[in-house]
Amino acid sequence: MARYIFITGGVVSSLGKGLASAALGALLQARGYKVRLRKLDPYLNLDPGTMSPYQHGEVFVTDDGAETDLDLGHYERFTGRPATRQDNITTGRIYQDILTKERRGDYLGATIQVIPHVTNAIKDFILDGNDGYDFVLCEIGGTVGDIEGLPFFEAIRQIKNDLPRGHAVYVHLTLLPFIPSAGELKTKPTQHSVKELRSIGIQPDILLCRTDRTIPAEERRKLGLFCNVRESAVIEARDADNIYAVPEVYHAAGLDDEVLAAFGLEAPAPDLRSWHEINARVHNPEGQVTIAIVGKYTGMKDAYKSLIEALSHGGIANKVKVKLDWIESEVFENEDAAPFLEHVDGILVPGGFGQRGAEGKIKAAQFARERHVPYFGICFGMQMAVIEAARNLVGIPSANSTEFGPTSEPLVGLMTEWLRGNELEKRSRAGDLGGTMRLGAYPAALKRGSRVSGIYGGALEISERHRHRYEVNTAYKDRLEQHGLRFSGLSPDGVLPEIVEYEDHPWFIGVQYHPELKSRPFEPHPLFASFIQAAVVQSRLV
């Protein structure tokens, strides 16, 4: 029977509960346990798919097509276990399910209430499908005291009572702020956070205290006394210089030992050699490359979380440090791109939606093509590269995307149908935004002898995760290929372009999918490893 670890947060938001959950999962996995990580989000949206990147950050897409919280990306990268739509739930989805059942008459006329109906739905979600796992780690979004989180806290309170003794542990992540004028760490915010938790019936077993310095023995004793936990269960969560150092930092602080002690379990010491190797490469690079990310949400780095990590993985694979130069694509829409891009070793244009900044991305693709600078276009970045080729190579000055409005030359258009397996999926042009994209893992057939096939080890078919409504128009394929832009990857039915590349360019690849979603520190995605390798070569030429 699985044991459950509930991770909650207090004092302030954005403390890193997702990263802490992922690191703890990795430590338990390194001890030989099988783990599952899940995220419970208290907001009323059905999923983050239609939420602004500036508010929510990245939407992480799973193989089965779920649009989920970015923390699931941390879970996958740290444990290697692919997440599914069953690993993320929101209040919106829970209410939708309950109201659907109510309309159907499933509740037989009962009055629908938060307790027991909402809390039971949350409990059912948490407990479902966990056979075969030793530990299930559940992160509760938000902070203790948030009104929307109360049903989730009540549900996990009940679960501990429902399970056999010793099968649930509460870990509370909190902040110990340092006050320079007083010269000391302050424990009072944590005491109040735990007091709030205890007022709703939850006594944390372990305090994971974020801090930038050592916790003095007196403060540790005070936290243990007033928060009603053992002093050994007050874990010092020191800031780390990179996220892949967190598992080793938390192990050194005793987090995994204390979790196992709370369950009354003993286990072999964790095998952290692979994590040690990753950190050795991060701390001892043999060079550095500069990559320009020409995006439209650069003011919110969390909008590109998986992309940042995938580039880091490419650097790890090549034993180099990857320096990121964030460039808002609007800045050179009406200017020459060269002054902004001449110093970089590679250009990456990521995904995005809408017309804002599109012309700047097209200019970035043109600069990379003409100057022979490595270029990686992802999703929207591929589409803009194709439009650039149509305008400046094929001679179609009005080439554009129908996403931006009516155009006489629709190089990129809205997909209204596509295949998933043997079934045809369709969408109305007037449909809602939510859930209307081509989402999840789809296969792509690669051309034999193409650069991209070589990067994938000679593979002729791959599977990658997608998130897009618009697609390059194959009606222009022959004309583009006549001018050197090769369509080296298509959907198996030959209808949807998946990959384009220039044969006479050091490294210029555009992909319609999101390879960053499948990159891991121990298994860097081959496209990112190859892109950074090309940037290393470019750095020696500049």
Swiss-Prot record:
Pfam families: CTP_synth_N, GATase. UTP binds at residues 13, 186-191, 222. One of its GO terms (cellular component) is cytosol. GO terms for biological process: 'de novo' CTP biosynthetic process; pyrimidine nucleobase biosynthetic process. Pathway: Pyrimidine metabolism; CTP biosynthesis via de novo pathway; CTP from UDP: step 2/2. ATP binds at residues 14-19, 71, 238-240. Keywords: ATP-binding, Glutamine amidotransferase, Ligase, Magnesium, Metal-binding, Nucleotide-binding, Pyrimidine biosynthesis. Residues 1-265 are annotated as: Amidoligase domain. InterPro entries: Class_I_gatase-like, CTP_synthase, CTP_synthase_N, GATASE, GATase1_CTP_Synthase, P-loop_NTPase. It catalyses: UTP + L-glutamine + ATP + H2O = CTP + L-glutamate + ADP + phosphate + 2 H(+); L-glutamine + H2O = L-glutamate + NH4(+); UTP + NH4(+) + ATP = CTP + ADP + phosphate + 2 H(+). Transmembrane segments: none annotated. CTP binds at residues 13, 146-148, 186-191, 222. Residues 290-541 form the Glutamine amidotransferase type-1 domain. Allosterically activated by GTP, when glutamine is the substrate; GTP has no effect on the reaction when ammonia is the substrate. The allosteric effector GTP functions by stabilizing the protein conformation that binds the tetrahedral intermediate(s) formed during glutamine hydrolysis. Inhibited by the product CTP, via allosteric rather than competitive inhibition. One of its GO terms (molecular function) is CTP synthase activity. The active site is at residues 379, 514, 516. Belongs to the CTP synthase family. Homotetramer. PANTHER family: CTP SYNTHASE, CTP SYNTHASE-RELATED. This is CTP synthase. It comes from Nitrobacter hamburgensis (strain DSM 10229 / NCIMB 13809 / X14).
